[in-house]
Amino acid sequence: ALKEEACRRTQWHNPIPQILAATLETQISGYPVYDRELLTSELLSKGENTTLIGDAAHPMSPFKGQGANQALLDALKLAREITKKCKPSSNWREIGIRKSVLTDFESEMLTRSATKVKDSADAAKFLHSEIALHEGNEPRGSVIKRKG
C-alpha cells in the first residue's frame, strides 16, 4: 500500500519512479514525523519522583541528527546529578528527589534541547520545501536568506 501511494502521489523525475517500481514492497517503509510543543517545567514538576528524558521529554524530527545525542546527554547529566546530590550523607531523602535533583536537571535539559527541537522542526520544513530542490553552487542557507 505504501509503495502504491508513493507512486500515485508523487511526480518525481526519472529514474526515481523506475527505482520505486523495481523495489520490492517488503523493502519500502515509512513512518510519520510528529512535532509537538515543548514541555514546560511546570508540567514536568507534576511528576513528583519521576522525570522524562530523550524523546519522551523533547521529541524531534530526524532531520537534524540530534535526537539520540540529546537523549544520551540527558541520561549522562541526570546520572551525574543523582550521583552528586544523592550521597548517603546528603538530606535528599528529606527534601525529596524533585527538589534535590529533578527541578534543576529538567530546567537545564529543556533549555539545552529547545533550540535543537526548533532547529529539527525548521530542518523538516526546509527539507520538504521547494528551496531544498534549488540547484546552485552555493549553500542552501544562502538561498533561504535570499528567498525568505
Regions found by a protein language model. Name each.
Residues 1-148:
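FAD-dependent flavoprotein oxygenase/oxidase catalytic domain
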